[in-house]
Every structure is written in structure tokens, then in C-alpha cells.
């Protein structure tokens, strides 16, 4: 474990408003003058890390509790009745969680976290939007892991960080992991595991930036971050959208930095502890908090790593809905079929299938079919699959289209019981095909063509109203008629902005007893927006799919396709289910899969009526 000097502590436990409005230095007892790491606690108490012990110290300087440990690095988050803290045990190279009971004056060592498999250079905590606590363990050569705290420690993901990290801290409100890299500077990474760990430079050393020296400590500010450099100067940066603005540095000769909550800091200098008045103006505010619903089930991962899974569909067993099937495309392999427990029941090697949609009880003369239609990207064709009474699929036809780079599809059951299919091209073109059957074979007749300005993918047809919803990925959600004898005049429902964050992806329609809802994947912020499916298409809200640590199911993010059904599938799905593609399979890392959410959970979160 690398020695960490002047480690920065995030102790956001004093009342933020009070701390931000006052520059008075808290009374630091003389007994804490030489402590290696310090955190301010409610009621004037302190948590101090010395060379051989973690100590709980009262406002009067008296020691209330001591935990013998040779450790470095201290971080914490508030909990009922106290705080949850972590330190890095120098003897075992493991993270040691500690529960601090302020009323009883007790430090309780919790079970140590598992070995990371590398020496620890830094560790920091993160509290996500669900209120779940995580720990980032950072080692040499860019090795890092994210773990979930709780009654059972779970590895959430492995991630690559810079090769020589000395400090880390997390801005919970913005889901941002800050890491200081020796010889390079300060970086910001995404802390939310449900997404890519792309990095953004905050401040870099020459020749890449203007940072003058090494960073010796970090503290999170509202919409910003502060640091001490090797000269003891206080540095601050304000968040400005996706970039960072450096503010004038202050020469304080600081040796240690403590965050007091809000925009209040405390710096240990040769003249003693100071609380510099920052006159801080918060940077870009945190995104709007959305309700979080937990998945009830996840499918087995697809066989290929990378961007493989894409779009689900649901086949409802008319005799026993609990025996229904979930179809899912694998863009590198073919069609997958799952039961409602997420177990794979069938695989059809149909090639690079992108989107799929299902319609049931279709009428072709005296014949009745349940059919799935998928887009085949190598052939620019539609692949038709029949579905038998047990949910078994069989390829029935490959129908050519006039598209050059086929992408998405959705289907429409006409009032007469026929099947229409809409397919689109990356150049914005849509083709509307009427599926035919003659001589025991399926065919297709081109009925209409229309176009959006830029790349589309997701679409959904409402069999009841005859409306077709079309997503233009980077631009807007549109609506037109799904009927072949009507003009395809596009009317805008909503542009990308407050609710929809590009890309606009999967879509599905939920038919309740009295209300129908359109669900749209807002891929850019990993959320799902719910609209009324009838004009004026009022927004009913948005939600995210979080993780269920007890069941061991991670959340869903960067969703491509989705499907929703109001059928009674039994158990938690009595009011139906939503199935979504998960772009990042975590806890642990694996190939992509699909998640199922009970509609009842969504309805309760957004207060939706049936």
C-alpha cells in the first residue's frame, strides 16, 4: 500500500446550509493536531485516523472510542445514528468498514471486505441514487474494482483507471468519481456502474494543462471539487456541463483538507486550522432525480461479449400466461427465446438480427398464426418466425426489402387481423410492408414509404388506435397513422431535451383497462419515459431501473429495445411486465442480457391508473 500524505476527507455530515453560510473555523481539539486523517461529525465530534488507531473524539477532545488498526485512507457516509466509514488496512491490504454509533460512542469493525487481488493505493465511498453504498478499490497499474456494501459484499464491476492513482473521492449527486493521478493530474470518471467508465480531464499537468504540481488531497464541493497541491495551495474547479472551469488558487500552505459539508472547507496550515471563505457558486446542478424501480428477473447473458443483445419481444401464451416467452435478438448470432424465469429455452442461428416484434392470432384466410418479425442486417431483409402453442419458434420466411442498411422494425395487427411490418434504414427511410400468404408461403407487398431526416430505429404501432410512433434517435419522437390507406404525415410528439435524451431507442405500448401508455427508452440518461398513448401525449413521468442486491440483479442502462405487455403473467406480473435490454451487465461483469420489471412497480412509482 502506497503511503498517502495529507489525505483529503469528505465529511459531509455537518448541516450543509449552516456550513456554507459560515466561515468560522470549527474548534479542533489540540489532541488532533498530529492526526493523519480527520473527518468532522455531527455535534462537534471527530473521527481521527492515526498511525495505529481509528479514534472517535468528542467536541471537548476526549477520546470516546478507539479501534486498533494500522490503516490509511478514510472516507465515510452518514447513516441513522452515526456514520459508516472505511479505511484501508495496511497489514491485510483490505478495506475495513467501520460503523460509528455516535449516541453510544462506539466504533464497530464490520467484516473486512474481500481481497481485491492487488495492493491498495486508494479507496473511497459512493452512495448511489438508490441510497446503496459502494466502495471503489484502486490499485497499481490502473486496476480498480467497485464493490457494493451491505449484509453481503458484492463485486459490481472491474474498471480501468490511470496507472498511478494517489487519491479518490466521489460526488454522489453527480455520480462522478474523481481520481488524482501522479504526474498527470485530476480526472473525472462515471461512478454509476450502469454505464461506461469514460474519463474527462479536470486539470492536467504540462504539457497537457496548467496544473503546476502534484495533488495531495481532494474534497467534493456542490457542483465542483477542491484539492491541495504539493505546495499547499488550495485549488478549486467548478463543473461547467461536461467540462471544468479552474478558479484562482489560494496560497494557504495547507497540509490537510477537510470538507465540512456544502461549500465549507477546513485547511490545516502552519498557523493552525482555517476555514477559507470560498464565496462558492455551485456549478452545473445535478440531474433531476427520477424514481427507481427494481428488476424482478434477468435473463441469462447472451453468448457474445460486446454490443450484442438489442431488442426484446413478448409472446403471451393464451392458455397459460405463466408459460409465455421472451424473445431477444443477438446482433451477432440470431434469435434467443427465454421463459419468464430468464432461462434460455431456444436459440435460432438466424444471423445478425437487430429488432424483433410479435403479433398474435393473425388471420391469413383460414389459417391462424402467431408471428415474430425481425430485421436481418446482412441481407437487408425481414425474417419471419412462426410461434407454436408452446412458444417454440421456427423460421418461416426471409423477405427482401428495398433498404440498403436495414435497422429497426415494428409490426401492426390490422383491424382485419392481418400483419403489417414497418422497417427502417439508417438513412431515415421507412418502408411499410403488408405481409401476405399464398400457396403456403409468406410474402410481402410494399404499401407505403416515408422518411425522417436522420437515423431512426425504434418504433411501435398501437393496434387499438391505429397510431404509429417513430423515434428519430438524435432528434425527436414522431407519430403518424399505421394504416396503409392513410398518408404517412409525421407529427412531432416531443423533441430531445428535458425528458428524452438521445438516443431515442426502444418503444412499447401498455394497454390498461382504461388508459394506454407509451414507454420510450431514453438511452442518453438510461431512463424510461412514459406518455399517454393518446393525444396530446402527456408525459406521465420517467423512471430508471435500479439494482436489487438481495436478488443479485443489477440495474439496466443504455437500453436499446424494450417491450411491455399488460397480460396477467402471474405473481408480481399480474398487471403485466416491461422487458428491457441492458447495455451493461454488472454484479458481476458479463455479456449483455434483458431485465424484466413488474408493471405494478412502475405504476406505483409514477402513480399511473389502469
Where are these regions (language model features)?
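Gram-negative bacterial Sec-dependent N-terminal signal peptides
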Residues: 1-20
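Sequence/structural signature of beta-propeller domains
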Residues: 20-610
